[in-house]
Amino acid sequence: QASSDVTFTFTDGGVTGAGDSTAGYEIDGTALTITSGGTYTVSGSCADGSIKVKKSTTGVTLVLDGLTLTSENTAAITCGKSSEVTILVSNGTENSLSDTEQNNDDNYPENENAENAVIKCKDGSTVTLCGDGELTITANGKNGIKSGATTDEDGEASLTIRDLTLNIDAPVNDAINAEQLLNVESGTLTIDAADDAIHCDLVLNIGADGTDGPTIDITNCCEGLEGAELNVCSGDITINASDDCLNAANSDLTDYDFTMTISGGTIDAYSSAGDGFDSNGDLTITGDTVIVWTANTADNEPLDADGTITVSGGTVLAAGGSSGMDMNLEAAQPCVIYGSTGFGGMPGSTQSSLIAADADFTIEDADGNAVYRGTARCGANFILFSSADVVADSAYTLKAGDSSTEGTAQSGTVSTGMGMGGGFPGGGQKPDGELPEGFDGQMPNGEKPELPDGEVPEMPSGERPTPPSGQGSPTDGNAPAGDSTSDTTPTA
């Protein structure tokens, strides 16, 4: 068993350490291998070095105490199969780990040492990354942190992150990628990733009930948080994504019960070219604050689920280009929807936004009291709002500049499908299902919608009225001018 206080210093010339080379570690040039449990403190700077915890080694605490370490062709830190390791970032210290483009066996198949991550946790390893210091990871090869799978041979695998300040720059692939179980319990994370910011093939937990949770700032990514089972229990999360901000999915799993559950914390998310929250199963929101915007294009949906979307608590503002196709929404807590259905979200739509980008807006009750106040992240044709202040069957007005749009709060099973009816603003049809005056049944792009039987019903007189403008919509067929931003006293 190694001493509980073995200290190593990295330099470009090698690694120096106190104690006998047989006492739980081996040094080979700038490569340090830990072979026995104990506490090991590492510091210094090295342009090409590495730390490895040997397979099946348990009870290891690796203390980063002002370490700057780059590894050219492998991981800077590797936790072997079936190992149990705590990587502790020492209080008040700044530490940096990085690799090079050679640490990627897809691009460098001849590199037998490539681990495809700056920190590699192999199958069956249980790793905790924690401490009160700061760690910056730069992943020039592939991933920032990679955690392995649970296997019969190697045992259960998990990765837990807590307390520390963690900065990850991953210009090639994922910032954090886990195969089995990933718990981000607390700490401050800042992430810039080419692909996923935080990804887990199976279970991803953010925060925990009754805790403040982590602060996560994802400045750039393709997808933000992704797991087959995605649970957000607490935390303060900001996401700027080009695809889905939150995604419950795994293309390698078939016949799986995908779930996305948001029970606490604050999420402020924006997608420039994808869905806001996308679940391949059910999507459930029970608490705290969810603000999600998707760019104002036809196929971007702020909330999207193959199963049921349930809103039963918290403050929820979901705004975007469209409501998508049929949204199976169960509003245990009443929701008010603006621009919900009709033609506004369909491809080829010329519908203008309910609310324009950067517009300040409010949602007010019948007495003029603001139940929500915010600023639009982008233009939106569709806005869903829910909070504890919203009362079923009551009227709420969305106001942005000189524009206002009325809505009525609904509870229970709420239809937001893109049929011929509903959602008069931008929908081209009145809530009662009658064609508005001056409307000839055309889509905004001039194409007639197909009805189930393929026929367009005749008006009672047998003729269609001629639109005043000669076009197929009242005035321009667009939603009321202006932007829509919601504001419920929490601000967006």
Question: Whereabouts are the PLM-identified features?
Answer:
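A composition-driven surface/loop motif
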Residues: Q1-A492
